């Protein structure tokens, strides 16, 4: 389970990008995060995997406080967080199998990684997941020869090879056509159920969020202002999520006496 409490991210002296944000994602739950550009959706995901350092607050994954980890402990924790990217983040000149096995780099020695001599168990696991998502027949094909949907499937398998405790997906369908987008969203949902994995998806397509996720979180300029079932996301909720400006929200925060961040005691 992912538990986020009073998360704040501030760049320099600017207004926080994330403002006292709290969120829980249980196992076997697919949660989508929607909101206008600049709402803080991508920053939230990057704080979870510590690609961006939180300013304050706590992020716990299965009882481990990720914000307190440093060095080797942080590297080990990152191995357990699978990340799926909008731009796929594949090494184009490498084969599908080589890209997939890169998900095991944190588990093998430097020499094994350098010479791509992965244990047979890793290779077997790679074939298992490639068959599951329908790309096993592309194992020896270069990544730059694949379609967008095929590349994203490679990205999904690479994340699964990390043996993750959670999957984070940052706009996983933004570069895909509508049919392929639906296939990828359906795949993420089924994998969550099969592997008892929590999945947190940053997504712009509200229709896909309503069709393929268990819960929708609506963000507006650093705050969560909607958190509920897809069926409860009505026009009024949509207007609240996508209306306004940062200036309007700052004025509303001041009028309501809402703090931008909690000062640790």
Question: Where are the model-predicted features located?
Answer:
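Helix-to-loop junction immediately C-terminal to a conserved catalytic motif
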Residues: 49
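Conserved ABC ATPase "signature" region
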Residues: 64-65, 108, 112-137
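ABC ATPase NBD coupling module
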Residues: 66-82, 112-120, 233
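Conserved ABC ATPase signature
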Residues: 142-146, 150
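Conserved catalytic motifs of ABC-family nucleotide-binding domains
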Residues: 163
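Catalytic Walker B motif of ABC-type/P-loop ATPase nucleotide-binding domains
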Residues: 167-170
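Helix N-cap at the start of a conserved alpha-helix in ABC-type nucleotide-binding domains
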Residues: 178-180
């Amino acid at each position: 389970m992912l538990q986020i409490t009073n998360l704040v991210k501030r760049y320099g002296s600017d207004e926080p990008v994330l403002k006292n944000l709290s969120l829980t994602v249980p196992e076997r739950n697919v949660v989508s995060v929607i909101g206008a550009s600049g709402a803080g959706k991508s920053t939230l995901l990057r704080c979870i995997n510590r690609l961006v350092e939180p300013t304050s607050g706590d992020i716990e994954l299965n009882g481990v406080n990720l914000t307190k980890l440093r060095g080797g402990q942080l590297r080990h924790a990152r191995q357990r967080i699978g990340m799926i990217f909008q731009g796929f983040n594949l090494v184009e000149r490498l084969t599908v199998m080589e890209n997939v096995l890169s998900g095991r780099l944190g588990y093998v020695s430097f020499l094994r990684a350098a010479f791509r001599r992965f244990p047979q168990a890793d290779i077997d696991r790679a074939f298992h997941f490639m068959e599951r998502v329908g790309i096993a027949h592309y194992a020896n094909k270069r990544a730059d020869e694949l379609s967008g949907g095929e590349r994203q499937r490679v990205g999904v398998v690479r994340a699964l090879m990390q043996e993750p405790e959670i999957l984070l997906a940052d706009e996983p369908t933004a570069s895909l056509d509508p049919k392929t987008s639906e296939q990828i969203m359906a795949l993420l949902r089924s994998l969550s159920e099969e592997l008892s994995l929590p999945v947190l998806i940053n997504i712009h397509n509200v229709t896909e969020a309503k069709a393929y996720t268990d819960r929708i979180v609506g963000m507006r300029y650093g705050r969560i202002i909607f958190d509920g079932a897809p069926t409860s996301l009505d026009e009024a909720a949509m207007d609240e999520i996508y209306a306004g400006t940062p200036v309007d929200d700052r004025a509303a925060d001041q009028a309501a006496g809402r703090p931008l961040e909690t000062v640790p005691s």
